[in-house]
Amino acid sequence: MKIGVIGGGQLGRMLALAGTPLGQQFAFLDPAPDACAQALGEHIRADYSDTDHLRQLAEEVDVVTFEFESVPAETVAFLSQFVPVYPNAESLRIARDRWFEKSMFQDLGIPTPEFADIQSQDNLDAAVKRIGLPAVMKTRTLGYDGKGQKVLRHPEDVVGAFAELGSVPCILEGFVPFTGEVSLVAVRARDGETRFYPLVHNTHENGILKLSIASTAPPLQALAEDYVGRVLDKPDYV
């Protein structure tokens, strides 16, 4: 099988490193001339919105995926006309926007802190009055390694916070006091079969993941699998 990957960065590279020993071939579409995955497959150097090169990719591969959720949803929708794309466009639409993510969690009955859509400083001021402080403000899209977010602890932190995050659509979340963070990796096949890896406990330093250690907490594992199973089934994630 030849797999097309939107993005040729470190995540695409790791995908190819895992897939090549299994006999899979790869083609990467990435605008960067030095995309680090290019040594592991064909490199189509083009913008993610370049429909001519997207069509070329679709004609050369059996299936397409993407290495991160920052890919434009329009790219996936376009490719889906010509070749199977997994995860699907609906999964990407949700995963790339924190408002859609939180709304889905709420719809699925997964415990979620109170949150509000922020489109202006006035929105933020009103949301803070309703949700209270401390709270966490995040950009709705992008943001990683601690970027694109701000913890609001005091009234003075609220002043100018919308502009500080770039005056882009944001969400405000109620602050959750926590003792630790855990993550669960799951996979779901086209027929709906789902498998789960063991929970890992994460340690961050300055907003960047530093260490993940496998957990041995069966009750928490079962709860996490229940929540993740709901999230995967909702958009028919593959």
Which residues fall in each region the model found?
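Active-site nucleotide/adenylate-binding loops and adjacent lid/helix of ATP-dependent enzymes
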Residues: 94-183, 187-234
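ATP-binding N-terminal substructure of ATP-dependent carboxylate-amine bond-forming enzymes
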Residues: 1-100, 122
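Short, intrinsically disordered, charge-balanced linker/junction segments flanking boundaries
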Residues: 236-238
